[in-house]
Amino acid sequence: MVLCKGPGTFTGLRLAFAALKAIELSFDIPIYGVSTLECYAFPYKSFNGQVISTIDAKKNQFFAAIYENDKIIMEEQDTTIETVISFLDKNKCILCTGYESQTFCTLLKKTAPELNVISFSSAGNPCLSLFSIAEKMIEEKKEPLKDFEGPQYLRKSEAELALEK
């Protein structure tokens, strides 16, 4: 079995993990976890330029990662448009992809008009990417998720932030 381990909504990630962990424990079927951002970028791994995989995280923040030639240029993080721009090569074509990536792409073009930015109005099917990445993980004999592993949260929840105050 395979699931997106995040980033994503707190509730959605917890529900996915709870459901698949129950099946895993009942039937001894391993679970492989794949990054949501990696799934969005996967169809463009041969793109001649940089691929920014994003999810609008609200509050002027984005969950983002940058890839080039199937290599990670910027690790996944909860970040700002300015931080993402600092990792970009201004001499390369830049492709935006991901959930609601149009929001990010529009802001990127406005903030850094010198960049050669492209995006598509519709993205590929992330489910196909999810299964392709999982098949590769199995072929490469990568470890499935451990029993104690859970979602990948790049941001603290509102409740955690309230406790810190």
Q: Where do the PLM segments sit?
A:
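DPxDG-like acidic metal-binding loop motif
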Residues: 2-31
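Catalytic-loop motifs flanking and including active-site residues across diverse enzymes
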Residues: 15-16, 80, 126-130
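Long, hydrophobic/aromatic N-terminal blocks
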Residues: 1-7, 76, 81
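Acyltransferase
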Residues: 119-165
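Surface "functional belts" at beta-alpha junctions
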Residues: 30-124, 153, 163
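Buried hydrophobic packing segments
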Residues: 19-23, 40-44, 130, 134
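Glycine-rich, flexible loop/turn motifs
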Residues: 6-13, 51, 75, 149-150, ...
